[in-house]
Amino acid sequence: MGNIKIMGGDFSSQLELEHAAVVAGFPSPADDYKHERLDFNRDYIRHPEASFYGDVTGDSMKDAGIFDGDKVIIDRAVQAHDGSIVVAFWNGEFTMKYLDLTHKSEGYVELRPANKDYPVFRVEAGDNFEVWGVVVHLIRTFEKF
């Protein structure tokens, strides 16, 4: 079931990259004059004290575009809602799934994979369960260095 390894985040370092629009059609001559800088921490980490990253293992979320080897940024300060992709601690393991709250009034919630080859987990009131955080960003490496 476990399909994510939680890692501590060191968001104190500054990673600044030159920003350039990536055009899928014809490039604009005005792009030569853009000099905005991307600060990963400023632009993507809203709650540094509550943010972590996770290494994704497995393919249970592949139909959501999350693949084995990806990294996700998890924010524990964000409130999960129905349909959120969450990292949950359930029965002693971390797992990443869609949170389905449609049956909450009936006493259970569901953790839904984004791959039909995996089962839906029904989480009952007495289960050892916690929504540990909400997945807010995905990082994928296309080219290995």
Annotate each predicted stretch with a short phrase:
Residues 1-62, 93-94, 108, 129-132, ...:
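Short, positionally conserved secondary-structure boundary motifs
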Residues 52, 82-105:
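Short, compositionally biased
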Residues 63-64, 72-73:
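Charged, well-structured alpha/beta interaction segments
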Residues 69-70, 84:
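Structural motif
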Residues 73-74, 87:
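Hydrophobic beta-strand signal
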Residues 94-126:
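Aromatic- and Lys/Arg-enriched surface recognition patch
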